[in-house]
From Swiss-Prot:
Organism of origin: Dictyostelium discoideum
Residue ranges of coiled coil: 419-490, 830-874
Binding-site residues, Mn(2+) 2: E899, D1023
Chain intervals with Low complexity compositional bias: 41-79, 118-154, 182-202, 467-485
Polar residues compositional bias, start-end: 104-115
Free-text comment on the cofactor: Binds 2 magnesium or manganese ions per subunit.
Role, per record: Nuclease required for the repair of DNA interstrand cross-links (ICL). Acts as a 5'-3' exonuclease that anchors at a cut end of DNA and cleaves DNA successively at every third nucleotide, allowing to excise an ICL from one strand through flanking incisions.
Cofactor: Mn(2+); Mg(2+)
Protein name: Fanconi-associated nuclease 1 homolog
Residues annotated as binding Mn(2+) 1: D1023, E1051, V1052
Length: 1087
């Protein structure tokens, strides 16, 4: 462990506890998880011997040796201590906890200070229990209460016995700090016997109160640490284990709080003065003592002028402080913080007027302004990042923010059991031993047969024995090498307790992810291409070592270095293609094709290799590559195969080749084509890049939004309400109209009624009609809202004259739709606010006159909330929305624009219990997973083959009622984070109708495609799903055959758009099943 005062190496054991060190939060004793169980608050010690008294002089010498003068308590890592101003008594039970104390002493540092036992004299002998059995019963009762009320009850508790226990069996939980001791100066002796007679003993209630006071982020942090430490303890070295055990067992609560706070902040450096004046003091009693504790145990380190660079802490300064340091340079005040940091870094730059470096001057100024600062030790940060990676199995998550969000927002995850290393039963062990014996017998028999055959070969073919032996030796060597390669890179999850079998594999993966993050930052920031090429060269070297290796579990390959290097090289191909370095891309692609990683990208790699050869005018080579990919690659997806077949047909045109080899073309000439429909609509040009084209509807679409309003009800009679309402409305409404007219004229906007706007839109350009339609909607809302707001203002300014139900809109009530194009940002809201101010000032005098007259009649008002509906007309939409309007008016179809999302949702819901089956090993490594680790891989189907096949058969023979049963069971998990499920987009009623229209057979057919090849069929489905319920009696129609409803799949294409390869595959699959599929072409009416 690192220390700031001495130049010492890292300790291989927990650091010693300073006997002269005082911590105000400890309140007289070292608090750790061991003390939580060892210090019995209900059991007195055994017969004490002789008390040792200290004089006042000795107490003064003790005070001088302490670093903090808050109390006079000495600290020992084991013994209980109770102290007053004149006497210090330390005692512990020798007979009850002898074995446990010896084990804890072995785990501590040999250099830790040993304080002799100071046992009290005969004053405490009367408090000894009568029998030892009562003492053991009291201990058991106390530990049961603690176990029930502990928030981090993750592991098994320590049993109260006298037998020897291992260190790993201790309960790893958060320590608690005892309350302050109430010492007096008049007493001369104290006893550590019963709680009633001792003021320093911490009761169970006090400990439970301290546990409840712990923040949720600290609990989450400890849960993550404890879970990973127990499950993956083999991945940590001794120094890292010391850090983890010190965090869980040795540090007090305040130190833990401070460390977690600093770890979750952006650092790395923090000013101590800022920490002491922050809000942390509300939850941490003594921040200074917590910092000293963390520094002593090696978690934090102080800034040192000799050890660290002052530029690391310069970022803590504010912009005004940086300007004062760099005041000697003529730098514009408008410059950013980075400019001033670059200036005070001391590096020479253009415009520097001195030959000598001002670095020492800047260094002194920065250090004086920053003051004392601390940071978390780099090794500690990397350790806990690794712990969080192993807990969440997400290398983009470095802290417990997802757990914090889960606690705050109430986000739920599916119910499953996280995989743990299970102890094999005796029956399983015997069966495995029998199988091993059988395998050994078979291997021995095979060896004997081979030896006999070799003898026969030697006698018959003596002349060619040398050559045959050499060949056999070579073959055996090759087989041995292959076996070694498989063992080296194969991840056998049936034997290992973790996906990472050893520490070396974990560290390699961590370094590879850091390299990937660095390369992405270089690419996004437009960094040096030379640095990026150096990273790619490392990837090439490392990936070349694992090209010929084989693996069993493809989902576990995600956590290997080869997978990461493959991804880096894959996305870098696009960069070099833009730079027209086609040969370099081909070299990368040839290596990627030979690797076993990222099989879903193989089709993309083959296509890019063919295209790059075309760029280099190597058509013959491109043709050979296309043929090789179709012949030899069994991992080609259907859409990728269709694209390569198109390249093959193009390259095989005469005179290069007159005939394509048989068996290579599987899709190009066999795909079924859908029916084509063309509709014409007037296009609205928005002249904005990156936005879809919009087309006018035949009839405006009506959209209803709900607005929350507060109603202030007066206690006056209805007659008075009607009188005041008529007087106010007649005066205010005329002013509203005049004010809106002036505002609109100044903004060059014309007021039109909806009828006038529709009649005039025919004589306007599309963009003018779009503006007018938007403004009509805005003005209609604005005028109504202005009237309500004026009534609100008059009632607030003149509360005693209010006599009607006044509607108060929320400030954000204008933003009532997700369609931003309907409301130009801030325009209508600004008009409304100006109207409110002007009209309020104009009627203020009348309100003051009415205030005096109605002051005596005004009663107390009551507030209520109501929801009102607001109707908005939408005049234009996307090609999909226009198509939905067309099929609604022509055939009465109902439908949604969903593409593949609705079918993935149905697939997950109908297979929920199979997907989240905890019996599949190693697929659930964290409680924060929205899907198993193998979801979407080849192993997902093979490991659950029987269950999936049975569910598909059940769906094929299901009627509507059977589908509803499965759907309702899965809907009980509504709100859980599940991959592919959006609970808010569709309701249970909508899913039920869609399931009824689709039928069990079609749902089973689509589910089989998603199960067997999720990566290919999880995209590319037609845009629209249409359904229509026929007006027939359900009694006369068999729901099982789905004759009472009709469905239609529609792929929508705009001008210049065409079907993609995977879309053509989906269309062919649906038509082959018997579905009605169409392609709707939306074209501009003018053209």
């Amino acid at each position: 462990m690192k220390s700031n005062t001495k130049n010492s190496v890292k300790r291989k054991s927990p650091p010693p506890v300073n006997p002269n060190k005082k911590f105000p939060s400890f309140e007289g004793k070292q608090t750790s998880i061991k003390d939580f169980f060892f210090n019995d608050t209900t059991t007195p010690p055994k017969t004490p011997t002789q008390p040792i008294r200290f004089t006042q002089n000795n107490n003064k010498e003790n005070d001088k040796s302490n670093n903090n003068n808050n109390n006079n308590n000495t600290i020992t890592p084991i013994k209980k201590t109770t102290t007053t101003t004149t006497v210090v008594v330390e005692s512990f039970d020798d007979s009850r906890n002898t074995n446990l104390i010896q084990q804890f002493q072995k785990a501590s540092t040999p250099s830790s200070p040993q304080i002799p036992n100071k046992l009290p004299q005969q004053e405490n002998q009367q408090q000894i229990p009568n029998t030892q059995q009562q003492q053991i019963k009291q201990l058991q009762q106390q530990q049961q209460q603690q176990q029930q009320e502990s928030p981090n009850n993750l592991f098994k508790t320590i049993k109260t016995t006298t037998t020897t226990e291992t260190f790993e069996e201790f309960l790893l939980s958060q320590p608690t700090t005892p309350p302050p001791s109430n010492t007096t100066t008049t007493t001369t002796t104290t006893s550590s016997s019963s709680p009633s007679s001792s003021n320093n003993i911490t009761t169970i209630d006090d400990k439970n109160n301290l546990i409840k006071n712990n923040r949720y982020y600290l609990n989450d942090f400890l849960i993550v640490t404890e879970t990973v430490y127990k499950r993956d303890k083999h991945l940590f070295i001794n120094d890292e284990k010391d850090y983890i055990e010190g965090m869980i067992e040795t540090l007090d609560r305040d130190s833990q709080h401070l460390f977690v706070r600093l770890y979750n902040r952006k650092g790395p450096w923090f000013q101590i003065n800022e920490l002491k004046s922050s809000n942390y003091q509300n939850e941490i009693k003594n921040i200074g003592a917590a910092i000293e504790s963390l520094v002593e145990y090696g978690f934090l380190e102080y800034y040192s002028s000799d050890k660290h660079d002052y530029n690391e802490i310069a970022n803590l300064l504010k912009i005004d402080q940086l300007k004062s340091i760099a005041s000697s340079f003529s730098i514009p005040n408008s410059s950013g913080k980075e400019t001033f940091l670059k200036v005070i870094s001391g590096e020479p730059f253009k415009g520097q007027s001195t030959l000598f470096s001002p670095k020492p001057i800047y260094k002194k100024k920065v250090e004086n302004l920053v003051g004392e600062s601390i940071k978390i030790v780099t090794e500690v940060v990397e350790l806990w990042r690794m712990i969080h990676h192993l807990y969440f199995y997400s290398w983009s998550t470095h802290d417990s923010k997802s757990m914090i969000v889960n606690n705050i927002m109430g986000i739920k995850y599916p119910e499953y059991t996280v995989w743990k290393s299970k102890v094999k039963k005796e029956v399983q062990q015997k069966e495995e031993e029998v199988e091993k014996e059988k395998e050994e017998i078979l291997q021995n028999q095979l060896i004997q047969v081979k030896q006999e055959s070799d003898v026969i070969d030697l006698t018959q073919n003596s002349s060619g024995s040398s050559n045959n032996n050499n060949n056999n030796n070579n073959n055996n060597n090759n087989n041995n090498n292959n076996n070694n390669n498989i063992k080296e890179y194969d991840i056998d999850l049936t034997e290992n307790e973790s996906i990472f079998p050893n520490r070396e594999s974990l560290l390699k993966y961590e370094n590879a992810r850091k390299l990937e993050e660095k390369s992405i930052n270089l690419y996004e920031s437009g960094g040096d291409l030379v640095a990026l090429e150096s990273i790619l060269q490392v990837c090439l070297d490392e990936l070349g070592r694992s090209v010929s290796k084989k693996v069993k579990y493809s989902f576990a390959l995600k956590f290997t270095v080869g997978w990461v290097y493959t991804r880096i090289l894959s996305w870098s191909i696009d960069i070099f293609e833009k730079l027209r370095k086609y040969q370099q891309c081909i070299d990368f692609l040839m290596l990627l094709i030979e690797s076993p990683y990222c099989r879903g990208k193989r089709g993309y790699w083959w296509q890019r290799m063919i295209i790059n050869h075309k760029h280099l005018h190597r058509s013959d080579d491109a043709l050979l590559i296309a043929e090789r990919s179709l012949k030899e690659d069994p991992f080609l997806r259907s859409g990728d195969r269709l694209a390569i077949e198109k390249h093959l047909i193009q390259l095989s045109s005469p005179p290069r080749r007159w005939r394509i080899p048989a068996g290579l073309i599987q899709f190009s000439y066999k795909l079924k084509e859908p029916i084509s429909t063309t509709i014409y609509r007037e296009k609205v040009s928005n002249n904005q890049q990156g936005y879809k084209s919009k087309y006018l509807f035949l009839t405006p679409q009506i959209k209803i939004n709900k607005i929350k309003k507060i109603i202030i009800k007066s206690s006056q009679s209805q007659n008075n309400q009607q009188k005041v309402q008529s007087s106010l409305s007649s005066q205010i409404q005329t002013q509203i109209q005049t004010q809106i007219q002036t505002q609109i004229q100044s903004s060059q906007i014309q007021i039109q009624s909806p009828i006038q706007s529709q009649s005039q839109s025919q004589n306007q350009t599309p963009i003018q009609s779009q503006i007018n339609n938007n403004n009509n909607n805005i003005l209609a809302i604005s005028s109504q809202k202005s009237f309500d707001s004026i009534l609100t203002t008059t009632s607030i300014n003149n509360t005693q004259s209010s006599s009607q139900n006044i509607y108060i809109d929320e400030e954000t009530s204008l933003e009532i739709t997700s369609d931003d194009e309907l409301f130009p940002p801030g325009q209508s809201y600004k008009i409304e606010k100006e109207n409110q101010l002007q009209i309020t000032n104009s009627v203020k005098k009348e309100e003051e006159q009415e205030e005096e007259e109605e002051e005596e009649e005004e009663g107390q008002g009551q507030e209520e909330e109501e929801e009102e509906e607001e109707i908005i007309e939408i005049t234009h939409g996307t090609v999909e929305e226009v198509s939905l309007e067309h099929y609604s008016q022509n055939g009465g179809w109902e439908g949604i624009h969903c593409e593949t999302s609705i079918f993935i949702t149905l697939y997950v819901l109908y297979f929920w219990d199979i997907i989240f089956d905890s019996n599949v090993p190693h697929v659930f490594q964290s409680p924060f997973q929205n899907s198993p680790l193998d979801f979407g891989s080849d192993e997902f189907y093979f490991t659950r083959k029987e269950a999936i096949d049975n569910r598909i058969k059940r769906l094929e023979h299901s009627n509507y009622d059977d589908l509803l049963i499965l759907l309702n069971q899965s809907w009980l998990h509504n709100g859980c984070e599940a991959r592919g499920v959006n609970w808010k987009s569709t309701s249970l009623e909508q899913l039920s109708i869609i399931s009824k229209c689709l039928g069990g057979k079609l749902i089973a057919f689509i589910s089989r495609l998603l199960t067997e090849d999720f990566k290919s069929f999880s995209h590319g489905m037609p845009d629209l799903l249409l359904w229509k319920l026929n007006n027939n009696n359900d009694d006369d129609i068999d729901d099982k055959n789905n004759n009472n409803s009709s469905i239609k799949f529609v792929e929508v294409k705009g001008t210049g758009d065409r079907l993609r390869d995977q879309q053509r595959i989906w269309i062919d699959m649906l038509i082959s099943f018997g579905c009605d599929v169409e392609v709707c072409l939306v074209k501009n009416k003018k053209n």
